[in-house]
Amino acid sequence: MACARPLISVYSEKGESSGKNVTLPAVFKAPIRPDIVNFVHTNLRKNNRQPYAVSELAGHQTSAESWGTGRAVARIPRVRGGGTHRSGQGAFGNMCRGGRMFAPTKTWRRWHRRVNTTQKRYAICSALAASALPALVMSKGHCVEEVPELPLVVEDKVESYKKTKEAVQLLKKLKAWNDIKKVYASQRMRAGKGKMRNRRRIQRRGPCIIYNEDNGIIKAFRNIPGITLLNVSKLNILKLAPGGHVGRFCIWTESAFRKLDELYGTWRKAASLKSNYNLPMHKMMNTDLSRILKSPEIQRALRAPRKKIHRRVLKKNPLKNLRIMLKLNPYAKTMRRNTILRQARNHKLRVKKLEAAAAALAAKSEKIVPEKGAGDKKPAVGKKGKKPVDAKKLKKPAGKKVVTKKPAEKKPTTEEKKSAA
């Protein structure tokens, strides 16, 4: 299948190229805006709604009055009387059985929406441009794999068809009948209450036939399921983009296809059949951004890239980070080394003192002579059977005498002083 070309071939009723070519209208190059199409479709579809409302008397066709407080029941109005289940039941409220609904619907709701004319035309232009792209048409679910060309244009002789069998034969010759078979396969019963409201069966959408003059073409195609017929002068966004999604499969007659430039104009000429209307333009004529940025015109205007790298300095604590301290104060390394040596030297002196004290204590214990014989020698113990103190636990040198505290003298009381006197 061929893609969009500047010249479009016109196909005959036999499904072959007739040899005639038509220039591609400018509307098929318009910007495709799915957001605008969806917005316009949503608002225009609201204009087909029928106003509805509930009765103003619904839920209030009874006499009920609140019982007030003091009865340990809710203060909702209750039906009067007795002798029936209804008496004493709640009424009027939206939470009550048989009561009115919350905010009863009114017929004066704002049902319709106004859409700008230019915006509606923009949506139609986008839908037409999308119908010429095979990828978008296939993404919508249309079976156009065997269709010879998009957009598909046929001769004006088709507009004079009056029999459905002629229309079916044309669709089969154009390889568009697969899309109709898809519609037949999709026919099914509607889910929900629409079955009760004369909307029992649903089906998918098929091709959209766009013609210029009705010489019987409507009668020929209207009985084929899924087919939509549109006059080129009365294009409808609800038909060109069902559901608000672009990509409808369209089949054009030659005269309708040629009329598009007069209806929507080109970028050099305004539309002749519409007053003061210009075709919307692209914001970017070339969407290849990398090609634009690498073009010599833009590269000449750009300055050379800055290759110097500026790194943020991370502030570190020199009291915890030796490398940063040495960077600030190189003498800190010498001070640190001297401190370590001094601590090692002091440790050696402390160990020597403890060893000397232990040796002196051992010599003193050997000089003590026991009263009994040498055989009855007992191990030297401290006072009250305590173990001898280790040399390491001694805090004072052995040369000094241990000062013992004298017991404090008891002072005489005042009574003792009086008796003594």
Curated annotation (Swiss-Prot):
The modification Phosphothreonine is found at T266. There is a cross-link at K239, K327 (Glycyl lysine isopeptide (Lys-Gly) (interchain with G-Cter in SUMO2)). It is found in: Cytoplasm. Residues 393-404 have a biased composition (Basic residues). Residues 365-421 are annotated as: Disordered. The modification N6-acetyllysine is found at K14, K106, K259, K333, K353, K364. It comes from the Eukaryota. Residues 365-379, 406-421 have a biased composition (Basic and acidic residues). There is a cross-link at K364 (Glycyl lysine isopeptide (Lys-Gly) (interchain with G-Cter in SUMO1)). Component of the large ribosomal subunit. May bind IPO9 with low affinity. Interacts with RBM3. This is Large ribosomal subunit protein uL4. The gene is Rpl4.
